[in-house]
Design a protein with these regions (language model features):
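Alpha-helical segment proximal to the catalytic Tyr-Lys
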Residues: 5, 49-53, 111
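Short, small/polar-rich loop/turn modules that mediate ligand/substrate recognition or access, typified
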Residues: 12, 52, 57, 113-115
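Short, flexible catalytic-loop segment of classical short-chain dehydrogenase/reductase
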Residues: 24, 62-73
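Active-site loop immediately N-terminal to the catalytic Tyr-X3-Lys motif
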Residues: 25-31, 53-54, 90, 95, ...
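Active-site helix of classical SDR
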Residues: 36, 44
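Residue(s) in the substrate-gating loop at a strand-loop-helix junction
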Residues: 20
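A short, exposed helix-loop element centered on a Lys and neighboring polar residues
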Residues: 1, 45
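Short C-terminal tail/terminal secondary-structure segment
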Residues: 25, 102, 114-129
Length: 129
């Protein structure tokens, strides 16, 4: 709500929420986390409908396995095994790859995209669809 007055004054207002692939297909390891991220997905869709008439786009990125502080404690061998078995690209992503997708949703080329839920997951959800 605090940002809305500023977004309304912007030439190309964008909101990009970050959820997780856990919101799209829970692994059963952490139900509260999956539920919270699913809430972000629902909020994104509701905001897209509510703010669309004002020209504000709202989209959501759902990172999959990415090398972050959250995944740092996982042994490297375990990460590699998981990625080979579960992702089409057979690797963990880098934070920069998520950042680049976030930036791309703020470019003029994305001006007609709103309410989208975009997995940035190396093909994890494609294999689980």
């Amino acid at each position: 709500r605090t940002a809305l007055p500023h977004l309304r004054k912007s030439k190309s207002p964008r909101i990009v929420n970050i959820a997780s692939t856990e919101a799209l297909g829970a692994t059963g390891r952490d139900s509260p986390y999956a539920a919270a991220k699913a809430g972000v997905v629902g909020l994104t869709r509701a905001m897209a409908v509510d703010l669309g008439p004002e020209g504000i786009t709202v989209n959501c990125i759902c990172p999959g396995p990415v090398r972050t502080g959250m995944t740092a404690p996982i042994p490297e061998d375990d990460k590699n095994t998981y990625a080979r078995r579960r992702t089409a690209l057979r690797r963990y992503g880098d934070p920069e790859e998520v950042a680049h997708m976030t930036l791309s949703l703020c470019l003029p080329a994305a001006s007609f995209l709103t309410g989208a839920i975009i997995p940035v997951d190396g093909g994890l959800m494609a294999r689980n669809a």
